[in-house]
């Protein structure tokens, strides 16, 4: 049985839709990717055009497949940089792993010619104390990251370790436990853009 959060949401952006001369990249995630997507697009403006799909829906929920269909509709993507893991904590870790397998299957079916890069989930810290990891929630983030790494390694999909960058400096945090300051988003965008640029080269 799917147990959703009290409020679920999703967002779609397609930047520079008029550009046909550059490869198109799709970023998939939650509000974390929404925080750095425009910055990544700015950094890649001479190399690629960027779209992003962010959602609160957890893998395993059938709704995410309907959202994926819309995110991929109308464009051929050269690269998909994707994540899911900070929402849906009513979902057990075994169910998360099973749902992630189906999520990857769907992405590969929708973009069979694209390069795929998994981006792991970022840390959850104590609200107002960004130097402290949340003792209840962050261990689950780490376990989901471990499960995802095992899945991606078996499927020969590269893993982008954004967790290690996000956790490296409390100044990157906005202080709310989840999201990032301007400095943090700039740092995450620098890294993600570099990973994508290298993969497209």
What do the predicted segments below correspond to?
Residues 43-46, 64-201:
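Alpha-helical cap/lid subdomain in secreted, periplasmic
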Residues 1-76:
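Serine-esterase "nucleophile elbow" of acetyl-processing enzymes
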């Amino acid at each position: 049985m799917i147990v959703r959060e009290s409020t679920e949401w999703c967002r779609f952006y397609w930047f520079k839709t008029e550009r046909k001369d550059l490869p198109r990249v799709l970023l998939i995630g939650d509000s974390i990717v929404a925080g750095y997507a425009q910055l990544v697009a700015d950094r890649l403006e001479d190399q690629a055009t960027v779209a992003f799909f962010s959602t609160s829906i957890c893998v395993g929920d059938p709704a995410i497949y309907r959202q994926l269909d819309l995110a991929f509709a109308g464009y051929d993507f050269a690269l998909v940089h994707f994540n899911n893991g900070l929402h849906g904590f009513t979902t057990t870790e075994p169910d998360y792993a099973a749902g992630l397998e189906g999520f990857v299957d769907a992405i590969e079916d929708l973009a069979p010619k694209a390069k795929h890069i998994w981006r792991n989930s970022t840390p959850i810290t104590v609200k107002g104390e960004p130097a402290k990891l949340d003792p209840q929630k962050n261990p689950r983030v780490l376990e989901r990251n471990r499960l995802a790494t095992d899945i991606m390694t078996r499927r020969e999909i590269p893993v982008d370790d954004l967790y290690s960058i996000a956790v490296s400096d409390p100044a990157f945090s906005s202080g709310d436990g989840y999201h990032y300051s301007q400095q943090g988003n700039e740092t995450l965008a620098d890294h993600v853009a570099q990973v994508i640029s290298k993969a497209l080269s």
